[in-house]
């Protein structure tokens, strides 16, 4: 066992003494050491309940002959960080979390890990760190939040972001907005739709890294405690059997996750996180081109918020990810999972699917997959749109650019009534390096939706979008403005042509004009000169490469 390097032999007497100071016995030190990686915090609703889950995991570890050691990582709530400088730290926190997991596990000689994340960057961050070690691990995601209810209608966090736009144009009163605020988020869990946190939980299960149904069991459901306990027991088996993550995370496993993502219409942020996770196995193991290629294999089969009518509770009751695998059985690759059964064995074990929620492939919500990769002179390395949450009339759009050099400039213009039907809002200098941190543009997109412009106005950015964004929102434009991408040279009034069906995005300019404008661009000057974001800005790769640190 790896932990023998910490605890075995006369030379390790000082090490054992320190462990005994923590309350561990000689008997405990004979067992496999299991790190229980928690991300409990009192400021993030997706994480406020994780102490209960970590206790359940530890019970499972003890019951099956292991010794658990709990430690914590940071966890940022994108919703609380949204719309201000704090959002610049969200994506970069993924790398801190990965480094923390790697450092703690290696320093203390853990034989296996159970990861307990919930929200957006914590899920991929923990997995990335654990993959660097290539020791057995299982993920217990914290689970979705239940939707709230206002005046007989379900609501959740995005109802409020869009409510701000509705208030600005007089659709609702401030009192009504306040009333929605009181009931939209009723308790623990990740936001109630198929936003980034829940998308990543679903893909983690599809990768084979969580036990079946884990992704969709809700935070307040006792089933979540039971599956946490079962996971604690299972990790001891994986350590004894030496089942490494690289035995599970083959190219085909990643393809399964991407197929599930495309079929469900998950968050565009998955196109950052899946390549970043795969990068820990091999550079460019998975790229945007894989999303593009696989998007032709499956249709969009689930109508889940923000692009549809259902919530995560509906997906769970419809059969969860195993039911999605069953529906996609003809496309799914047969891969290993931490459960011990193969992906197809899990799919074949499903006895019930609600086909009103998870549609059959031959009767989909949309014929096209839920995510689309676009390329053209504006984004030669690619950009991403959640086409499953776009009004079909906006699948093709041509309009004049309204250009803003930050999210703050753009939101002021949108709320100030400066955007009209037909416009293409361009927000630049918000990329991984230029932002820095690639802020999510949920406030601008929600304002556009709330004001009723989402069927006539497109938004393009080198930043990214919340999983809760809907409408014609095209993000991750690569190269970004800070890297000299064409988005840096667009001017007000330039005509931008978008064709989501043909996967194209271009600005209507002669090549000679493009070259002249690019030649006049000033050299990028980092906005932040000290601290973590200064280092991040210098070291981060492009969005099309997963925004990983070089």
UniProtKB/Swiss-Prot annotation:
Functions in the biosynthesis of branched-chain amino acids. Catalyzes the dehydration of (2R,3R)-2,3-dihydroxy-3-methylpentanoate (2,3-dihydroxy-3-methylvalerate) into 2-oxo-3-methylpentanoate (2-oxo-3-methylvalerate) and of (2R)-2,3-dihydroxy-3-methylbutanoate (2,3-dihydroxyisovalerate) into 2-oxo-3-methylbutanoate (2-oxoisovalerate), the penultimate precursor to L-isoleucine and L-valine, respectively. The lineage of its organism: Archaea, Methanobacteriati, Methanobacteriota, Methanomada group, Methanococci. [2Fe-2S] cluster binds at residues 119, 191. Pathway: Amino-acid biosynthesis; L-isoleucine biosynthesis; L-isoleucine from 2-oxobutanoate: step 3/4; Amino-acid biosynthesis; L-valine biosynthesis; L-valine from pyruvate: step 3/4. This is Dihydroxy-acid dehydratase. NCBIfam families: ilvD (TIGR00110), PRK00911.1 (NF002068). Binds 1 [2Fe-2S] cluster per subunit. This cluster acts as a Lewis acid cofactor. It is an enzyme of class 4 (lyase). Its EC number is 4.2.1.9. It catalyses: (2R)-2,3-dihydroxy-3-methylbutanoate = 3-methyl-2-oxobutanoate + H2O; (2R,3R)-2,3-dihydroxy-3-methylpentanoate = (S)-3-methyl-2-oxopentanoate + H2O. It comes from Methanococcus maripaludis (strain C5 / ATCC BAA-1333).
């Amino acid at each position: 066992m790896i932990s023998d390097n910490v605890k075995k032999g006369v030379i390790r007497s000082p090490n054992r003494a320190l462990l005994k100071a923590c309350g561990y016995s000689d008997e405990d030190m004979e067992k496999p050491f299991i790190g229980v990686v928690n991300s409990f915090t009192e400021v993030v609703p997706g994480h406020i309940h994780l102490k209960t889950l970590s206790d359940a995991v530890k019970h499972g570890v003890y019951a099956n002959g292991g010794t658990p050691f709990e430690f914590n990582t940071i966890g940022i709530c994108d919703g609380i960080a949204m719309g201000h400088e704090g959002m610049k730290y969200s994506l970069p926190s993924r790398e801190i979390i990965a480094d923390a997991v790697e450092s703690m596990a290696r320093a203390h000689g853990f034989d296996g890990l159970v990861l307990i994340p919930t929200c957006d960057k914590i899920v991929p961050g923990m997995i990335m760190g654990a993959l660097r070690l290539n020791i057995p691990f299982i993920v217990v995601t914290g689970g979705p939040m239940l939707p709230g209810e206002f005046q007989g209608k379900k609501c959740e966090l995005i109802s409020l972001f869009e409510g701000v736009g509705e208030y600005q144009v007089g659709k609702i009163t401030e009192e009504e907005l306040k009333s929605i605020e009181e009931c939209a988020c009723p308790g623990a869990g990740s936001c109630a739709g198929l936003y980034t946190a829940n998308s990543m939980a679903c893909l983690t299960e599809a990768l084979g890294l969580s036990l079946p149904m884990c992704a969709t069991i809700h935070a307040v459901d006792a089933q979540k405690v039971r599956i946490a306990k079962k996971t604690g027991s299972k990790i001891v088996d994986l350590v004894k059997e030496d089942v490494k993550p690289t035995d599970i995370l083959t190219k085909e496993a990643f393809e399964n996750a991407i197929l599930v993502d495309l079929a469900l219409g998950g968050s565009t942020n998955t196109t950052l996180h899946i390549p970043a996770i795969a990068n820990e196995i091999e550079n460019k193991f998975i790229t945007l081109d894989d999303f593009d290629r696989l998007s032709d294999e499956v249709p969009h089969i689930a109508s889940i918020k923000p692009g549809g009518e259902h919530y995560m509770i509906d997906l769970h009751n419809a059969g969860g990810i195993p039911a999605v695998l069953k529906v996609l059985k003809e496309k799914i690759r047969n891969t290993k999972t931490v459960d011990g059964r193969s992906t197809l064995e899990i799919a074949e074990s499903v006895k019930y699917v609600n086909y009103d929620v998870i549609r059959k492939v031959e009767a989909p919500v949309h014929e096209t997959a839920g995510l689309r990769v676009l390329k053209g002179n504006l984004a030669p390395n690619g950009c991403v749109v959640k086409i499953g949450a776009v009004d079909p009339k906006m699948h093709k759009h041509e309009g004049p650019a309204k250009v803003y050099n930050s999210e703050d400039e753009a939101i002021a213009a949108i709320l100030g009534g400066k955007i009209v039907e037909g416009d293409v809002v361009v927000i630049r200098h918000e990329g991984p390096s230029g932002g820095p941190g690639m802020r999510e543009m949920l406030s601008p997109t929600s304002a556009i939706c709330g004001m009723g412009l989402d069927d006539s106005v497109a938004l393009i950015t080198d930043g990214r979008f919340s999983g809760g964004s809907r409408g014609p929102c095209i993000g991750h434009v690569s190269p970004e403005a800070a890297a000299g991408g064409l988005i840096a040279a667009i001017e007000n009034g330039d005509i931008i042509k978008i064709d989501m069906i043909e996967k194209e995005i271009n600005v209507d300019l002669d090549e000679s004009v493009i070259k002249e404008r690019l030649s006049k661009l000033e050299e990028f000057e980092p906005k932040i000169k000290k601290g973590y974001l200064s280092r991040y800005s210098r070291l981060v790769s492009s969005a099309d490469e997963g925004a990983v640190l070089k």
